[in-house]
């Protein structure tokens, strides 16, 4: 009834994105809900964005596509048949998470270097530190998107704390019966 995909799509890659989403769509119940979290970059507009993408492709996620802007991701979800119910752009929060990862990375420097060497330690140190900066300045982000499979199978205001006093499951009392 529910599926959660946490940053899996980046590793699927652009060439397999549509197939991945079709498979997820087929697995989800008709009244199901999916939380789809995906990292992405804004559309490239400065030189740093190109350098970042090349670095990521060579050293961090070879063959993965963590560089898709939000409009592309939403389009893919909609073409797969999903209805987007909500979207949160959480890059600034994600940068705080990555900051903690970097602190853990540095705290375990000796262990990492002993097991993987100086080069890998430095590459990932650069990656984590740069990820914090690029997320804080808006160049990259993480998108948390809630989608449904069937527009009519779920109440559209469920999950909204207050929507003008409307209740997700209407009281089926006299008023409800008189309207229908």
Where are these regions (language model features)?
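A short glycine-rich, Lys/Arg-flanked "PGG" loop and its adjoining helix->strand segment in the class I
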Residues: 18-33
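Short amphipathic alpha-helical segments
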Residues: 16-17, 48
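Short, cationic low-complexity segments
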Residues: 160-180
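A conserved beta-strand element that flanks and buttresses the S-adenosyl-L-methionine
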Residues: 4-9
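Short conserved loop adjoining the S-adenosyl-L-methionine
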Residues: 1
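Alpha/beta-hydrolase-fold catalytic nucleophile elbow
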Residues: 37
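Substrate-binding/catalytic lobe of Class I Rossmann-like enzymes that use SAM or dcSAM, i.e.
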Residues: 40-157
């Amino acid at each position: 009834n529910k599926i959660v995909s946490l940053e899996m799509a980046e590793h699927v890659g652009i060439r397999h994105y549509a197939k991945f989403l079709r498979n997820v769509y087929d697995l989800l119940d008709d009244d199901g809900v999916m939380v789809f979290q995906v990292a992405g970059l804004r559309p490239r507009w400065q030189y740093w964005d190109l350098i970042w993408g090349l670095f990521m492709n060579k050293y961090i996620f070879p063959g993965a596509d963590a560089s898709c802007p939000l409009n592309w991701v939403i389009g893919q979800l909609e073409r797969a048949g999903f209805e987007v119910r909500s979207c949160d752009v959480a890059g600034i929060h994600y940068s705080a998470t990555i900051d903690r990862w970097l602190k853990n990375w540095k705290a375990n420097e000796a262990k990492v270097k002993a097991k993987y060497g100086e080069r890998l330690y430095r590459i990932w140190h650069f990656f984590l530190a740069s990820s914090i900066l690029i997320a804080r300045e808006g160049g990259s982000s993480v998108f948390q998107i809630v989608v449904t499979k069937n527009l009519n199978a779920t109440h559209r205001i469920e999950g909204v704390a207050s929507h003008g006093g409307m209740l997700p499951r209407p009281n089926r009392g006299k008023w409800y019966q008189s309207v229908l």
